[in-house]
A protein has these predicted regions:
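Charged, solvent-exposed interaction patches on well-folded alpha/beta domains
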Residues: 1-22, 27-33, 40-49, 53-175
Length: 175
């Protein structure tokens, strides 16, 4: 007992509290998903002393998910492991014959999610990106990066224009 409060090293984890900051915009990740990821890859954290929970490991587990932009983990004196998640915000969806993927405004590619489809511009046809449907990360080829940057510029222009945003929902790329 120290200064009117229980010493942190005596407090055990009693549960998980998950906050998805942008859940009204995107629904790629849920509380149940975060709990499942942690149970599978971290192991049992309930009952552990809160000071012994590896918060960096918790964040790495959550951040490794393709639709997660960033997470923050912390514990509180009431024994809760708190995880705050910010999801990636896609601006365009690429649909190829072997599947598809999203790109965010920075050009980060990530797979389509089975649980949720974001309402963004769709581009199909002859897409000159070698990324397959399960790929996550940035484009490394300079020609592919230049093409992707042009596409993102067009999509941003359409999003900023009330006329184009309401009239175009899909773009087909021809050779």
């Amino acid at each position: 007992y120290l200064g009117g409060s229980i010493c942190r090293e005596k407090v055990t984890c009693t549960g998980l509290s998950v906050t998805i900051l942008d859940s009204t915009v995107n629904r790629f990740v849920t509380r149940a998903d975060v709990e499942k990821f942690l149970n599978k890859e971290y192991g049992n954290y309930i009952g552990q002393h809160i000071d012994s929970i590896d918060l960096c490991k918790v964040e790495k587990i959550i951040d490794s998910r393709s639709a997660v932009y960033k997470s923050e983990a912390f514990t509180t004196r009431d024994g809760k492991l708190n995880v705050t998640v910010t999801q990636r915000t896609p601006v365009v969806r690429f649909q190829k014959s072997d599947g598809g993927f999203y790109a965010d405004a920075e050009g980060y590619l990530f797979p389509l999610q089975s649980s949720y489809a974001s309402r963004v511009q769709i581009i199909d046809g002859e897409i000159p990106l070698k990324a397959n449907s399960g790929y996550k990360g940035t484009v490394t080829d300079p020609h592919e990066q230049a093409w992707l940057n042009k596409v993102l510029g067009v999509v941003n222009y359409m999003e900023d224009s009330k006329v184009w945003k309401d009239k175009i929902v899909q773009i087909t790329v021809c050779e």
